[in-house]
Regions:
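Amphipathic alpha-helical coiled-coil/heptad-repeat segments
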Residues: 1-23, 33, 37-40, 48-52, ...
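N-terminal signal-anchor/start-transfer transmembrane helix
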Residues: 28-29
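Short beta-strand/loop segment that forms part of the nucleotide-sugar
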Residues: 43
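C-terminal catalytic core of tyrosine-transesterase DNA break-rejoin enzymes
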Residues: 217
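Surface-exposed loop/turn positions within long extracellular repeat scaffolds
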Residues: 230-236
Length: 267
């Protein structure tokens, strides 16, 4: 009678051990399958909250990086337009120097003026047509804010149409004594505008590096918290399988032993 009772007491313990092994096997199998140490809140309540926060920061940084890349592209387009205009103005300077040659006749000067007028028309076209996503970049003064994380970078666009007109560039008489002054003033103005866009792009590049570093660090931290240690998970899975097999064997032996006792008692 005492032996039967011991068997009855041991059987629940074996069942409990088997259940624990089953649960651990299920957990480790899920970790191996998903590659994640945390698959539900109950796995690590504190860890999952930290992981969620890191994921949010990574996603916010991704949005910021897209904004920064758009801003950088905008600055590059503007600088490309200014570079094209500057090349044309440099050609105007060369033509103006030629026009100062006292050996030229009127026909020569008219030919040079025609070349200058064509260059000026091209400059005005470039000023009006340089744009990004439908926004004109060179003929309207305004501030374009690029939001990235908690901060923002401002790109200032110039009104080159009026600024160059104020320099007398678009009414340029290539043979006049003050033509070079107008041209040199225009070149200085263009250099300032190009420098402003280059400065904004440098700021955006710095922000991009900062956001990228932050995202990498956050991703590594999240990985340490959430990712499964595959070697450890595989080892624990093997251990759980062995424990499960042992529990099943012990349960079978306990059931067989109980059956023998009951058979003896029934005689």
């Amino acid at each position: 009678e005492r032996k039967a009772m011991e068997l009855q007491l041991n059987s629940p313990a074996i069942s409990s051990s088997s259940l624990h092994s089953d649960n651990r096997l299920a957990d480790t199998s899920q970790q191996i399958s998903s590659g994640q140490r945390i698959n539900r809140a109950s796995d690590d309540p504190a860890g999952i909250q930290v992981s969620i926060g890191l994921t949010r920061e990574i996603n916010e940084n991704a949005v910021g990086l897209r904004n920064v890349m758009d801003g950088s592209s905008l600055a590059q387009v503007a600088q490309g337009g200014i570079s094209q205009i500057t090349d044309s103005v440099q050609q105007l300077r060369e033509i103006s120097l030629q026009a100062q040659n006292g050996t030229l006749n009127e026909s020569d000067r008219q030919s040079l003026q025609k070349q200058a007028d064509e260059l000026l028309a091209g400059i005005q076209d470039t000023v009006g047509q340089t744009s990004f996503n439908g926004q004109s970049l060179l003929n309207e003064e305004r501030d374009i804010n690029i939001q990235a994380g908690d901060g923002s970078t401002t790109i200032n666009t110039p009104d080159l149409q009026n600024a160059l007109e104020d320099q007398g560039l678009f009414a340029l008489d290539i043979s006049s004594a003050d033509a070079l002054d107008s041209i040199d003033g225009a070149i200085s103005l263009l250099n300032d505008s190009a420098g402003s866009f280059a400065g904004s792009q440098a700021q955006l590049d710095s922000v991009s590096r900062s956001l990228t570093d932050s995202s990498v660090n956050n991703a590594e931290s999240r990985s340490r918290i959430s990712d499964a240690d595959m070697a450890k998970a595989t080892s624990e899975q093997s251990r759980a399988l062995i424990q499960q097999e042992v529990a099943v064997t012990l349960q079978a032996q306990a059931n067989a032993g109980r059956g023998d006792v009951l058979a003896l008692l029934g005689q």
